Amino acid sequence: MMTEHVLILSAYLFSIGIYGLITSRNMVRALMCLELILNAVNLNLVTFSDLFDSRQLKGDIFSIFVIAIAAAEAAIGPAIVSSIYRNRKSTRINQSNLLNK
C-alpha cells in the first residue's frame, strides 16, 4: 500500500515537471521543473530498489549520483541563465536563441 502512494506521488511530481517544461517560457522556471523531474526519478529509484531487493543498494547509490548531477546542474544552470540575461536582457526561452547572433 505504501509503495503505491509513493509511486503515485512520483508520477504526480514527474507530470508537473513535464507540464512545466512544456509550457514554461522562463528559463528559471524550466530549471525548477527539471529539478522536479529529477526528484521524481530519484523517488522511483529508491522505491523500486527497496521493493525488489532491499539488501542491495543499487537504486540508492544511483540516486546519489543523480542527486550529485542535479546539484551540479543547480549550480551551473543559474550561472548560465544570468549570463544570458546580461547579454540578452531577458530570461525568456523563445528570445534566447544564441545561434542567431
Curated annotation (Swiss-Prot):
Native species: Liriodendron tulipifera
Quaternary context: NDH is composed of at least 16 different subunits, 5 of which are encoded in the nucleus.
Domain of life: Eukaryota
Gene Ontology biological process terms from the UniProt entry: ATP synthesis coupled electron transport; photosynthesis, light reaction
A GO molecular-function descriptor: quinone binding
Topology of this chain in the membrane: Multi-pass membrane protein
Enzyme Commission number(s) of this protein: 7.1.1.-
Location (main, coarse): plastid
Compartments it resides in: Plastid, Chloroplast thylakoid membrane
Positions of transmembrane segments: 2-22, 32-52, 61-81
InterPro entries cross-referenced by the UniProt entry: NADH_UbQ_OxRdtase_chain4L/K, NUOK/Mnh_C1-like
PANTHER family per UniProt: NADH-UBIQUINONE OXIDOREDUCTASE CHAIN 4L (PTHR11434:SF16), NADH-UBIQUINONE OXIDOREDUCTASE SUBUNIT ND4L (PTHR11434)
Pfam families: Oxidored_q2
Record-level GO cellular component terms: chloroplast thylakoid membrane; NADH dehydrogenase complex
Full protein name: NAD(P)H-quinone oxidoreductase subunit 4L, chloroplastic
Family listed: Belongs to the complex I subunit 4L family.
Keyword annotations: Chloroplast, Membrane, NAD, NADP, Plastid, Plastoquinone, Quinone, Thylakoid, Translocase, Transmembrane, Transmembrane helix, Transport
Reactions the enzyme catalyzes: a plastoquinone + NADH + (n+1) H(+)(in) = a plastoquinol + NAD(+) + n H(+)(out); a plastoquinone + NADPH + (n+1) H(+)(in) = a plastoquinol + NADP(+) + n H(+)(out)
